[in-house]
Amino acid sequence: NQNKPSVEAVDLLQLLYNRHSLSLHLLLSEEDDATENLTINDMSMKEGLLNELETILLPYLTARIAALSSSLNLNNFANKDPDLNLTLVLINTSHLDIILSEIMYCIEKVTLGSPLPTESDDHYLNRCKRFRFSLLQTRATILVRENVSLLFQKSSELIQACTTSRDDPANSEHQARICDIKEATLMIVNNSCKLTSSLTNLLQKTDVALVQEEWLATAQSINSVLELLAHINNPSIESNLERDPTHIVDNGKNRKHIVEVGRSFIPFVKLIRLLLYKISTTSENKLPFISNTMNTDKLDRLSRNPKVIIEALTLLMQGLVTLYQTNQPIRDQDQICADFDTITETFHSTSLDICRYLVPLRDPSADLLWENIFGDYFVDLTILWHKALLNFRTIIGGSRPENEEPVE
């Protein structure tokens, strides 16, 4: 029966999709209940597994993904007679399953296999800090559950589509469907390889470099606040907005005030972006962090606080968009101001944390202390932030002193 290999391949791929789509689902929430102290042997074991993961398992995973892609003939969109080597597909799929299982076992053994010190007492553990393990778990989960498992599913769909096309070769719709599935599968392959490379880089990079990655991603995500502002700052979309009949007769005052308040967010967005780009793009040899003495608590706070600021600004802007769409006035000025006070405190604490973990390293070309350069930079940002905050409070109160220009 010529369809038997197809059935076997589809069944195996579906089985692996179901298995690996649930992989690591408890990894992020599991806690080790062991009470023994971490030993030198434990550390050696963890470091050995991390080395194996970096130098053997992850490179082999990339090779196996490429092999499965090749056996599925993903790069050939012109072949009108889709004839897959299903024996090779079965072999490559089995190899991919084995390496995934080894990687998951390795990560679980490293992160959960023996107790670690608390987040405030792991500064001496180098690659075995909870901060790094948390990133490793998160990225591995995304790789396995949201990418490689989908590769199994899409591969199964492709084989089924090719089988259907072989049974009805005159139907052009089958060819179109095969091309669509190939394109989607190839995208998953490329993304899986990128994520595998990201895991390898995570194992090689210092704590500071990993925090810089988080900062840079956060800086790029801040555009979401400006995109929300466009909803209330673009007159062309006003005709499509809802109108609350109880607030139509306001001569546009409600929306005009909301637009002014929304625009007063712009300086904060710019200042946060400046801060994040400054510290995320400075080369590590010029970024004088005491990286080997930072524990997980400090690293978590450094990477998390900018995200907290952007999330808070996004929520506030979403509230303004809702008011604008329904033509409602801003009634909770005090609460919004209180929220901005919290954002300001987080901004200050982030700047202070960065300065606190700097050490005085000299720049040979300028003969200046990097600590002082960063310190002055943060002082300037703080002054501009408070000017923007004063301007914001004036605007949200519904008035601005005469001849005062908005801060941007």
Task: Give, region by region, the residue ranges found by the protein language model.
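Extended, alpha-helical interaction "stalks"
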Residues: D207-E408
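Leu/Val/Ala/Ile-rich N-terminal alpha-helices, chiefly Sec-type signal peptides and the beginnings
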Residues: N1-H231, H348, L352, D363-E408
